[in-house]
């Protein structure tokens, strides 16, 4: 038996204890499981992590080679074993191999120079930024601009990812093509949806007689030669390293629209906040390592308690896109069926991540969370300081509801009426930012990245490839080029009905 299997067996043998009993039996529970880093409070005390479980998960982490894999990540080793690449996103924050950090800083300097040129109206009087990308080339910028760019007052930014023409059409109705800069974000610069959207934006500009539309295009890519082939001048290309994965790329040139919308100082604060979480993840021991503890929680509920999903509720309208961002980060990274060595995984991997915005979600899905038969670990994310000038009652009511939901999930209530009974003993984690600003949001996103990595180490899988997304794209291309004869009757009938 391997050490990792022995550690899992020890975890399975650990008796389950209710949350109320844990608070009774562990007087120091709140102080041990509520910790702060980079202006963010993480409260794990309402999860079933006992002192004994933490010790046994720490043994699992040791048996899984966690420390060595973490060090390899920051050293720039080829931790993406299936593609023989490093995962250099920490280097974008100054936390990585010296050569990688130096290269990232060079790319950032090029970004800053481009922003200076735009602000100097080298591209003409730009008011609108239209960013087209998909997946990691869009979700990160969209989250950050939506969360932090509301009052920046610099440029109006639209992020379009869907190939559905309705998405672009909605932007065309409110943007002026004469004042629009097109940003094309694609790691390979061959992404079907992105390139089709980019061509449509150029056609829209041409229809309005924009002089030389290609001079209004900025390319963000790890394949600059492809952007040149596509017709973009080398001086309009912002490259980034091929070893920066798409869903980890918002710190790289992919973050260009964020820096443009918020200003360079804000982008640097974002990087600094993430770097603070990087340092914590590198140096903190297992019992106080926030991303690793979060991974312990994930593995406990997924593997040992059979939870198939995890719900994230942002009690802050500015973070409404956070659940969508986390869906890609977590499920594309860890939704795998084989280990890094190619052997099959013998248990569940990534849970299904979903969520919404509080208090809206309370009136939609919390019925299931409180009284349903499925175990759903819940994560609450909130900020202490509001960003609006409305009556304080708005923010107070928001936070009171957030904290009340966590208390209710844990305590439950039995009043003698089965239809009105709440079983309780339902877990939640609360993440409380002092305020939502670039630094703290950077730290929060880096926390989720490292949590995802820690989960992968405990499971023995590679979180940096995504081969599962390829087959559907290949079939879509073959439908266009080869016809439908080789497909099943259902697929052929659907294509015939919709496409003729």
Curated annotation (Swiss-Prot):
Gene Ontology BP annotations: gluconeogenesis; glucose 6-phosphate metabolic process; glycolytic process
Enzyme class label: isomerase
Keywords: Cytoplasm, Gluconeogenesis, Glycolysis, Isomerase
Residue numbers annotated as active site: 332 (proton donor), 363, 473
Pathway: Carbohydrate biosynthesis; gluconeogenesis; Carbohydrate degradation; glycolysis; D-glyceraldehyde 3-phosphate and glycerone phosphate from D-glucose: step 2/4
Gene3D superfamilies from the UniProt entry: 1.10.1390.10, Glucose-6-phosphate isomerase like protein, domain 1
InterPro entries xref list: G6P_Isomerase, G6P_Isomerase_C, Phosphoglucose_isomerase_CS, SIS_dom_sf, SIS_PGI_1, SIS_PGI_2
Known catalytic reactions: alpha-D-glucose 6-phosphate = beta-D-fructose 6-phosphate
Superkingdom field: Bacteria
Enzyme Commission numbers on file: 5.3.1.9
Subcellular localization: Cytoplasm
Molecular function GO terms recorded: carbohydrate derivative binding; glucose-6-phosphate isomerase activity; monosaccharide binding
GO CC aspect terms: cytosol
Function of the molecule: Catalyzes the reversible isomerization of glucose-6-phosphate to fructose-6-phosphate.
Family: Belongs to the GPI family.
Name of the molecule in the record: Glucose-6-phosphate isomerase
Organism per entry: Rhizorhabdus wittichii (strain DSM 6014 / CCUG 31198 / JCM 15750 / NBRC 105917 / EY 4224 / RW1)
């Amino acid at each position: 038996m391997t050490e990792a299997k022995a550690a899992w067996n020890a975890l399975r043998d650990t008796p389950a204890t209710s949350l109320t009993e844990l608070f009774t039996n562990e007087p120091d529970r709140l102080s041990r499981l509520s910790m702060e880093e980079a202006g963010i409070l993480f409260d794990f005390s309402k999860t079933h992590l006992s002192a004994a479980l933490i010790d046994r998960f720490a043994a699992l982490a040791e048996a899984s080679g966690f420390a060595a894999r973490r060090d390899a990540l920051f050293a720039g080793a080829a931790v993406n074993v299936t593609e023989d690449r490093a995962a250099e996103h920490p280097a974008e924050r100054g936390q990585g191999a010296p050569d990688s950090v130096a290269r990232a800083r060079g790319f950032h300097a090029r970004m800053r120079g481009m922003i200076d040129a735009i602000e100097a109206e080298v591209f003409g009087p730009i008011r609108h930024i239209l960013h087209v990308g998909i997946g990691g080339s869009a979700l990160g910028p969209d989250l950050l601009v939506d969360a932090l760019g509301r009052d920046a007052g610099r440029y109006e930014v639209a992020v379009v990812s869907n190939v559905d023409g309705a998405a672009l059409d909605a932007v065309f109705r409110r943007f002026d093509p004469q004042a629009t800069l097109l940003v094309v974000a694609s790691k390979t610069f061959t992404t079907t949806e992105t390139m089709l959207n980019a061509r449509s934006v150029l056609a829209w500009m041409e229809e309005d007689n924009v002089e030389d539309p290609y001079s209004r295009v900025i390319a963000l890519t790890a394949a600059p030669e492809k952007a040149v082939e596509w017709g973009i001048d080398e001086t309009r290309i912002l490259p980034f390293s091929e070893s920066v994965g798409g869903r980890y790329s918002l710190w790289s040139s992919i973050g260009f629209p964020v820096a443009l919308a918020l200003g360079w100082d804000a982008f640097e604060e974002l990087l600094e906040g993430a770097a603070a979480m990087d340092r914590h993840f590198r140096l903190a021991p297992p019992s106080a390592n926030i991303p690793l503890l979060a991974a312990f929680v994930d593995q406990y509920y997924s593997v040992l308690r059979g939870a198939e999903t995890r719900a994230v509720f942002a009690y802050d309208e500015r973070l409404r896109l956070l659940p969508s961002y986390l869906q890609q980060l977590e499920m594309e990274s860890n939704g795998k069926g084989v280990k890094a060595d190619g052997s099959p995984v013998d248990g569940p991997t990534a849970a299904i991540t979903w969520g919404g915005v509080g208090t809206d979600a309370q009136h939609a899905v919390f019925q299931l969370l409180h009284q349903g038969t499925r175990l759903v670990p819940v994560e609450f994310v909130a900020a202490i300081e509001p960003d609006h000038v409305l009556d304080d009652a708005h923010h107070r009511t928001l936070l009171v509801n957030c904290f009340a939901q966590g208390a209710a999930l844990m305590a439950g209530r039995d009043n003698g009426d089965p239809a009105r009974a709440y079983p309780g003993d339902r877990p939640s984690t609360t993440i409380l930012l002092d305020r939502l600003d670039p630094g703290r949001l950077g730290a929060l996103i880096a926390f989720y990245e490292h949590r995802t990595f820690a989960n992968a180490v405990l499971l023995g899988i590679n979180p940096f490839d995504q081969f599962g997304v390829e087959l559907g794209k290949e079939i879509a291309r073959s439908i266009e080029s080869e016809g439908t004869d080789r497909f099943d009757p259902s697929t052929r009938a659907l294509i015939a009905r919709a496409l003729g």
